[in-house]
Amino acid sequence: MKIQNKTVLVTGGCSGIGKIMARRCLEKGAAQVIVWDINEAAIADTVKELSSLGTVKGFKADIASPASVDEAASTTKAACGAVDILINNAGIIANNKIFAEQTDRDIDLTMDIDAKGAMYVTLRFIGDMRSRGVGHICNITSSAGMLALPKMSLYTAAKWAAIGWSESLRLEMEREKSPVKVTTIAPYFINTGMFDGIRSFFRILPPEEVARKALRAIELDLGYRGINFPSHFIRLMQGIFPHSWFNFLFGDLCGLYTVMDHFTGRKKD
C-alpha cells in the first residue's frame, strides 16, 4: 500500500524506530500520522518536532490495557477518521534475568505489551478496515521470535507469539480474499537504546535502516520481511540442522546465547 495520502497510526511512535517511521511516513506524503505512546511528554515533544513535515497528532495509550486501547481508539477515530495503515511497533525488554528469577509482574508486563498489545490495538481497527475494503497492518516483531535466547525468555516467548499471530492473521485475510494486508517485520537487534549493552557477532541494525525497510515492505505488500542475516536463515537452519549442530553454530560460534550477559537497556529519563 502506498503511504502517500494515507492515515497512518504508529504505536510506540515517540521513540526509536516508531518515531523514525512516523517521520518517514510524513516525508512520504502521508495525509496524517498518528502516534500513540504511554508517555504524554514524549507525545507533545514528538508532535511539535514533526509538525513541520505535515499533519501529526498524538494520543496517550497503554497498549497493555484493553480499556486504555478502547479509549485511545475512540479518540483517534473521532479526531482523525479512519486509519489506513496500522503499525504495531510498541515493545519492551523488561530485564536480562534468567526465567527462574522473573516475577509474575515481569511475565504479565512483557506478554501484555510485546504479544497481546498488538492484538488489542488491531482488534479496534481491523473491523473498519474490512468493511471499508482498505487497510494494511504492519507488526514489528523480532528475529528473537524464532530463537531460544538465555536471559531473554520472556521477550522471545512474546515475540514467538507475535509472529505466530501476525502470520495467522495474514493467512486469514488472504483466505477470505480481503484487500486488508498484513506484514510481519522480524529485524535483528536494533541500535535504539532498547538493546543497549548487547554484544553480538552479527551487525546491530541502524534504526533508520529498519524503518526504511519496514515501510518499503508495506509499500510492496510483503507478507514477511526479515532484516539482517539471522532473520533470513534461522528457520532454514533450524529445519535442516540437528539441534546440537544449530546450538553449536549459533550459540558457541556466533555467541547468540550470551548476547544478554551485558545488557543494560534504555536508560530511563
Show the residue positions of the predicted features.
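SDR active-site lid
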Residues: L171-S231
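The beta1-alpha1 cofactor-binding region of Rossmann-like NAD(H)/NADP(H)-dependent oxidoreductases
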Residues: E40-A41, K60-E71, D104
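Substrate-binding pocket helix/loop in short-chain dehydrogenase/reductase
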Residues: K97-F99, T103-L109
